[in-house]
């Protein structure tokens, strides 16, 4: 069959049109490639949101049913949820120091509350500040000694705009004065106190700190920023502004199954408080839930600001807490012990383009692992002295050969304990004797000591060996405690 021949001028027009189309296509492809290259090289913003004394089970993304937390859950849905993330030491100052430095408490040297962070510590914020980031911090710091509230500590540790950083306290109402921010509730002597004093949606601590965060984000639309906001709630006192104060007054508060356990099921390092009863839990928890709800609503305001500014797709967002709150579990309140409610904390991370949405990280991690993981995602070099591990492969869904163990330690106030934790087991050695092994799969409420079971010997030996290696590598003096040393040696078959 002969081919149809177009007139010569039509062929020329067709060729010209083809060239124009090809040129247009090449232009689009070039611009797309340039845009992708720009996006790939454009540095991430870093936003760290920290709460205080927060039980992970109050969040929807960790199975909580009472408080709806859609904004915190959004972070989990669009990033990664770490299900076995622990406070390196489950009290305020040591945990916070470990998070910002990547070092264990004995190296910060914040081993207890109110100990100042060492002058030589280089935080993640300092690294990013040197890189050219605009950096800032608002909320509770608790790493500058005894000052209370002590606004804007002189030592900034890389958080350049620290006007709204205060060192200590769980204040409920803030305001501005000619001298700067102030606690806006005072006792009869004129000293700041923890009362609500009519705090509203503008002056209540959570709302006020969220607004400072929003202002910083809006001010830094065109330059990479690193900002950390540390909300003092839901730490006690259990009070919250209207309408959150009555939102959960009629809810049926679940009572922990461990609240009235027998003494035989209670380690010496965690004696129960006989004053803590089911009625105590019913009284305290509705306001605790209200604080969590207020936090979630304000985190929603912060996320909406990132969306409005088109920064949401270029910002690493981290949500975590410094430690948990037992909320009546094991007949105790607050923290300080290696029980799950005290030591296990929420940890969520969004990193657009690198962390797949909906990732679940089950392996055990602790606060010291945050900084190495963050810098693996941002491409920054770690400063000297960091002791944590880069877990970015886990968060990117590629960590098949991860060494599943984290190490926890007590404060330097009182009798020491050391713990090795995996996603299933928790082994605790204490100066008070009688090591404890919890199987979190078969005993999630931590009621039974599996240390004496014959079938536990292999995991006890392995975790003890790992704990000894950790102590040697990181110069942890607790391993030298006479009782702990003897119990570990016996578990390893080294006892005389």
What are these regions (language model features)?
Residues 472-475:
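Short arginine-rich
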Residues 23, 29-30, 38-430, 435, ...:
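Formylglycine-dependent sulfatase
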Residues 2, 20-25:
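Positively charged n-region of N-terminal signal peptides that target proteins for export
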Residues 13-21:
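Short, Lys/Arg-enriched N-terminal segments with co-localized hydrophobic residues
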């Amino acid at each position: 069959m002969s081919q149809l021949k177009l007139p010569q001028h039509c062929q020329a027009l067709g060729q010209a049109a083809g060239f124009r189309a090809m040129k247009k296509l090449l232009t689009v492809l070039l611009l797309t490639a340039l845009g992708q290259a720009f996006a790939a090289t454009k540095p991430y913003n870093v936003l760290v949101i920290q709460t205080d004394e927060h039980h992970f089970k109050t969040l929807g993304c960790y199975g909580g049913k009472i408080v709806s937390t859609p904004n915190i859950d959004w972070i989990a849905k669009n990033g990664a949820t770490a299900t076995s993330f622990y406070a390196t030491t489950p009290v305020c100052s040591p945990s916070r120091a470990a998070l910002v430095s990547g070092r264990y408490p004995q190296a910060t040297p914040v081993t207890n509350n109110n100990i100042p962070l060492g002058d030589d510590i280089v935080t993640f914020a300092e690294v990013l500040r040197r890189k050219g980031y605009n950096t800032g911090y608002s909320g509770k710091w608790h790493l500058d000694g005894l000052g209370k509230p002590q606004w804007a500590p002189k030592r900034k540790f890389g958080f350049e705009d620290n006007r709204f950083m205060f060192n200590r306290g769980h204040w409920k109402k803030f305001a501005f004065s000619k001298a700067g921010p102030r606690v806006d509730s005072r006792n009869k002597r004129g000293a700041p106190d923890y009362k609500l004093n009519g705090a509203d949606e503008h002056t209540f601590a959570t709302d006020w700190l969220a607004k400072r965060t929003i202002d910083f984000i809006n001010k830094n639309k065109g330059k990479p920023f690193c900002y950390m906001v540390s909300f003092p709630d839901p730490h006690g006192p259990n009070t919250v502004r209207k309408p959150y104060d009555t939102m959960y007054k009629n809810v049926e508060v679940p009572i922990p199954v461990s609240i009235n356990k027998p003494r035989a099921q209670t380690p010496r390092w965690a004696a129960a408080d006989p004053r803590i009863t089911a009625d105590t839990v019913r009284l305290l928890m509705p306001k605790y839930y209200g604080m969590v709800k207020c936090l979630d609503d304000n985190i929603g305001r912060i996320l909406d600001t990132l969306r409005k500014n088109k920064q949401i797709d270029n910002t690493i967002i981290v949500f975590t807490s410094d430690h948990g709150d037992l909320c009546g579990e094991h007949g105790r309140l607050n923290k300080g012990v290696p029980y799950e409610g005290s030591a296990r904390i929420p940890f969520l991370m969004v990193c657009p383009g690198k962390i797949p949405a909906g990732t679940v990280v089950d392996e055990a991690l602790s606060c010291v692992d945050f900084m190495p993981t963050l810098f693996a995602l941002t491409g920054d070099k770690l400063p000297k002295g960091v002791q944590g591990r880069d877990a970015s492969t886990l968060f990117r869904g590629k960590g098949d050969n991860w060494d599943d163990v984290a190490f926890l330690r007590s404060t330097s106030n009182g009798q020491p304990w050391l713990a090795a934790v995996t996603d299933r087991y928790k082994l605790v050695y204490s100066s008070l004797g009688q090591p404890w092994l919890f199987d979190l799969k078969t005993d999630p409420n931590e009621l039974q000591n599996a240390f004496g079971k014959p079938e536990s010997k292999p995991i006890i030996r392995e975790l003890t060996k790992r704990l000894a290696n950790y102590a040697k590598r990181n110069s942890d003096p607790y391993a030298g405690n006479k009782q702990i040393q003897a119990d570990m040696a016996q578990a390893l078959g080294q006892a005389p």
